[in-house]
């Protein structure tokens, strides 16, 4: 599998990553043997970046991944995340440190390659959302101390929130990576969208991350499954999901996804899932494309799609035409 450099970290990561969250659900609620088989097969396929978080299954994802890694002892790159709860905002440094230490215990590791902030970043922070001032003034110093202690090699953000706030944090150039929501339903992180496009406008965020030499981990590549074109969800996956930056609800995302099916009829891809993965890989600023899995078959299919490479320019042009039909619709 092709690899790309994860920004200024210098890490060579596979273009397809292994998401261990609840949307796919395998590493949260799956059978232990299936979890081990999936991780082992992913490694065989050349996937070397695995992404989890303390909040996935209230730590179950980390526990399950830790158990599998202890058995397999693989050579891979691992990222996890901290979400600072509203109740702990008075002492963010302690919350950050405590979260990583608990994650390391569950993962049965002494360090991770990448530690990421999971909170949304908004100009006016509320509840568990954080302002750029708090992120830069309180979170970053705590992350730096953890790096100095050898508990993480690099640190990053989850780039969800107010566009201006995200741009500001990226432009400061202190974070090594960003998880960026980017998919065929909302391409605004990677291009300029027309006024009236029914999605959150991330304002070409990938231009800011590139300028800051940040590695980019693309998330919501399949729009939480909507880009399969079906409303049915696997029993292991989250029964309900909230879109990040796309339609008002999952059903709207599925309806719009189906309107992209001319890509298949015209021979650009075999399925919406394949097109979605290859679309994200086509952006040169994306380092790795994170997909969550429910089954081993889904993993195999995603890897085969990634190995076909980026969508060709003609497919991207046709997709832009289809996306144009969304303009003016209510979000």
Write out the residue ranges for each language-model feature.
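N-terminal binding-site loop/beta-alpha segment at the start of enzyme catalytic domains
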Residues: 1-76
């Amino acid at each position: 599998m092709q690899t790309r450099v994860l920004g200024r970290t210098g890490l060579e990561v596979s273009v397809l990553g292994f998401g261990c969250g609840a949307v796919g659900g395998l590493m949260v609620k799956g059978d232990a043997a299936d979890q081990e088989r999936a991780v082992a097969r992913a490694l065989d396929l050349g996937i070397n970046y695995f992404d989890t978080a303390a909040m996935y299954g209230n730590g179950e994802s980390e526990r399950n991944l830790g158990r599998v890694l202890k058995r397999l002892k693989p050579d891979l790159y691992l990222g996890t995340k901290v979400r600072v709860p509203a109740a702990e905002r008075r002492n963010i440094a302690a919350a950050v440190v405590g979260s990583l230490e608990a994650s390391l215990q569950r993962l049965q590791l002494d360090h991770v390659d990448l530690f990421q902030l999971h909170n949304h970043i908004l100009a006016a922070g509320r509840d568990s959302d954080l302002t750029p001032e708090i992120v830069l003034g309180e979170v970053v110093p705590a992350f730096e101390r953890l790096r100095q202690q050898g508990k993480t090699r690099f640190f990053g953000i989850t780039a969800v929130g107010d566009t201006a706030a995200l741009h500001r944090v990226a432009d400061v150039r202190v974070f090594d990576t960003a998880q960026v929501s980017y998919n065929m339903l909302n391409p605004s992180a990677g291009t300029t969208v027309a006024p009236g496009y029914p999605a959150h406008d991330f304002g070409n965020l990938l231009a800011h991350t590139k300028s800051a030499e940040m590695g980019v981990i693309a998330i919501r590549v399949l729009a939480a499954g909507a880009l399969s074109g079906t409303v049915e969800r696997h029993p292991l996956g989250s029964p309900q999901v909230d879109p990040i930056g796309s339609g008002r609800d999952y059903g709207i995302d599925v309806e719009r996804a189906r309107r992209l099916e001319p890509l298949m009829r015209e021979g650009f891809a075999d399925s919406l899932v394949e097109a979605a993965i290859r679309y994200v890989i086509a952006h040169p600023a994306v380092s790795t494309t994170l997909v969550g899995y429910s089954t081993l078959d889904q993993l195999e299919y995603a890897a085969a799609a990634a190995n076909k490479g980026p969508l060709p320019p003609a497919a991207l042009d046709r997709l832009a035409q289809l996306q144009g039909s969304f303009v003016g619709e209510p979000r």
